[in-house]
Structure formats: C-alpha cells, structure tokens
Curated annotation (Swiss-Prot):
The keyword tRNA-binding does not apply. It comes from Bacillus cereus. It catalyses: N(6)-[(R)-lipoyl]-L-lysyl-[protein] + pyruvate + H(+) = N(6)-[(R)-S(8)-acetyldihydrolipoyl]-L-lysyl-[protein] + CO2. Its cofactor is thiamine diphosphate. The lineage of its organism: Bacteria, Bacillati, Bacillota, Bacilli, Bacillales. This is Pyruvate dehydrogenase E1 component subunit alpha. Heterodimer of an alpha and a beta chain. NCBIfam families: PDH_E1_alph_x. One of its GO terms (molecular function) is pyruvate dehydrogenase (acetyl-transferring) activity.
Length: 371
C-alpha cells in the first residue's frame, strides 16, 4: 500500500534554489579589464601586479612550447594549461613558501612557481623518476595522476600542519571531474570535521575530459558542495586573476586563523585538449563555445587592466616571452642530460630499506644493469 505525503511540507525547489543562490560568482575585473567590484579589490602593489602578469605570460609560453615539444616526441604526457592561468597562478600567488601544494596533473605551473626547477617539470612529463622528486625546499608532492586522490592527501597534510602548530596551509587542485569522485567528498568531510587548514580549488573548466559539467552533477555549482561538508564555499570568475587571488587570500587567512577549510570553485576553460594523448575537443564542444570563452581570456583582460594603469606594455611583454623561451631552451637541454632511467632507480627511491621480498629481484636487476 502506497503512502501519500503533503507536498506543501517539503519545499524542494525552494531549498535547491536557496542553496545555489548563496554562491554568486565573485568578479573584480570584467572581460574588458575594467574594475566592477572595487570593494573586493585585493591589496597588491604595482610590482606584485606586474609580477603576477609576468608569471601568466611566461606560463602561456611554457604551455605553447610544451605542446610543440610533445608533438616532436621530446615530451611525454602533457595536459595543456592555456586559459587556466588565472585559476592556477593567481591562486598560487596568494600562498607563502611554507604552504604545501598537492597538485593534479595539469598543475605543473604552480609547482614551477613554487620552486620546482623547470628541467624537472620536463622530466616529469617524460616519466623520469627525477621529475617526481621535489627539492627539499619545495613544499609539494608530485602531480597526482589518480583523479581526486589528492583531496584526501591534502586533508591529511593539513591536519598534520595543525597538529604541529604551523601557520601554513595545504592547497590542492582538481577539476570539475575530480569533484565527482568519492575522494573529493571524503577529503572535504575529514578536513571540515577537524578544521584542518586546507584549501580545495576546483578548476571548473566545463568538461571532465569529454563529459560536460551538467552531466556530472545535478548541483548548480561545485561551490555548494561545501555545504554538505560544513565548510565554506566560494565561486569565482576563474578567468579573473584578481578575483581568484582575493578568494584564495581570504581562504588562506581563514585557514591559518583556525577557521577551517575552504572550497573554491573557479569558472574557467581549457583552450586545448584534455591531454596531448589523442583527445579531440571538437568531438564534444562547439567552436562557438570555444570562441565565447576565448573572449574571457585571463591574460587579455589583465593586460588591459595593467595598461590602463600604465604598468604594462608590449615591449615589457616581449621581454617576458623571450625570457621564457630562453629558460625553456636551457631546461630542455638539462633534461636531455638526465641519466637513463633504470629499474633499480625506481626501487631505490621508493624504499629507504629494501623489503626482503624485493631484495633478491633488486640484486638481479642490478647485475643486469651493470653489464
């Protein structure tokens, strides 16, 4: 026998709308580079503004050159970053050196600006073990390949920071596809329960490889998923570097003051394929959509903003481009000199003390490699 309920008791539509309405998109610069939210303007000096722009231009060149090197067979796995410079670099710009980064595979630029030598970034793309070894002064893990797994790791690292009394944060990056993984919810829930100083950045570039965000989740925003974990959520224009910086700086301040983690959803777009491993974006998105997002380009709008303030010029930008090209040239040359990878290398870097069940295999490989 079925049951009947009084639907007037359950305001389903109103509840859903009310939740989504809490997460208005933060924007400071519009597509023309004009300030539309003076109250939210972050306190950045002229030199800081120019440095952020320099990093964005440099990283665009790095992306273009990396794609070219991949096509030449000189790089292996590569996930293009063009279009996401504001989401990646403006968020990183709000961090301190002692903060810990747990990136996804598209987030190599943040590692480079956090201190990872460029030649090691290229070695990571080539699958060389040296590319996964962070220098001791770089607080980061190598990029996570398993989608969403870094969320749980971030919760643990952040809790460790809290227990040690450190005034620093653990920040992680994933995409909208990562926000559909179980690890995403588990990590946020854990961090929220312990008020761990974590920042979860979801770069919503509209597609999990080829699956549009609308088919991944019924939620109107990714930011509202913070509600279930009892943490703070923000949605920002991910093509606006000032909005991304302001949101991240706010999240960091909350975290180090013991107020717990924050989920930041950046609305952004990747211009290229998901990776250079055969993905064809024309199969799942239209040229009109691509053109629409290219009109929002983060470098173009930030350039307009800085030029209006007299802080940037084509001459300055050309110097940055040439600097990037020269650095990349030298880094590739150094990466080419890396020793050939051996099986024993992988065993040695994995274990401080070789497990007994691998010791015999290790000796066998070592003998073979010595010949």
């Amino acid at each position: 026998m079925g049951t009947k309920t009084k639907k007037t008791l359950f305001n389903v539509d109103e509840q859903m709308k009310a939740i989504a309405a809490q997460f208005e998109t933060l924007q400071i610069l519009n597509e023309k580079g004009e300030v539309v939210n003076e109250a939210a303007m972050p306190e950045l000096s002229d030199d800081q503004l120019k440095e952020l722009m320099r990093r964005m231009v440099y990283t665009r060149v790095l992306d273009q050159r990396s794609i070219s090197l991949n096509r030449q067979g000189r790089l292996g796995f590569y996930a293009p970053t063009a279009g996401q410079e504001a989401s990646q670099l403006a968020s990183h710009f709000a961090l301190e050196a002692e903060d810990f980064i747990l990136p996804g595979y598209r987030d190599v630029p943040q590692l480079v600006w956090h201190g990872l030598p460029l030649y090691q970034a290229f070695l990571f793309s080539r699958g060389h073990f040296m590319g996964n070894q962070m220098p001791e002064n770089v607080n980061a893990l190598a990029p996570q390949i398993i989608i969403g797994a870094q969320i749980i790791q971030t919760a643990g690292v952040a809790l460790g920071m809290k227990l040690r009394g450190k005034k620093s944060v653990a920040i992680t990056y994933t995409g909208d596809g990562g926000a559909s993984q179980g690890d995403f919810y588990e990590g946020m829930n854990f961090a929220g329960a312990f008020k761990a100083p974590a920042i979860f950045v979801v770069q919503n570039n509209r597609y999990a490889i080829s699956t549009p965000v609308e088919k991944q989740s019924a939620a109107k925003t990714v930011a509202q998923k913070a509600v279930a974990a009892g943490i703070y959520g923000i949605q920002v224009d991910g093509m606006d570097p000032l909005a991304v910086y302001a949101a991240t700086a706010f999240a960091r301040e909350r975290a180090v003051n013991g107020e717990g983690p924050t989920l930041i959803e950046t609305l952004t777009f990747r211009y290229g394929p998901h990776t250079m491993a055969g993905d064809d974006p024309t199969r799942y998105r239209t040229k009109d959509i691509e053109n629409e997002w290219e009109q929002k380009d983060p470098i173009v709008r930030f350039r307009a903003f800085l030029e209006n303030k007299g802080l940037w010029s084509q001459e300055v930008e050309e110097k940055v481009i040439e600097e990037a090209k020269e650095d990349i040239k030298q880094a590739i040359a150094k990466a080419d000199q890396a020793p050939k990878q051996k099986v024993t290398d992988l065993m040695e870097i994995m274990y401080e003390k070789m497990p007994y069940n691998l010791a015999e295999q290790y000796e066998i490989y070592k003998e073979k490699e010595s010949k």
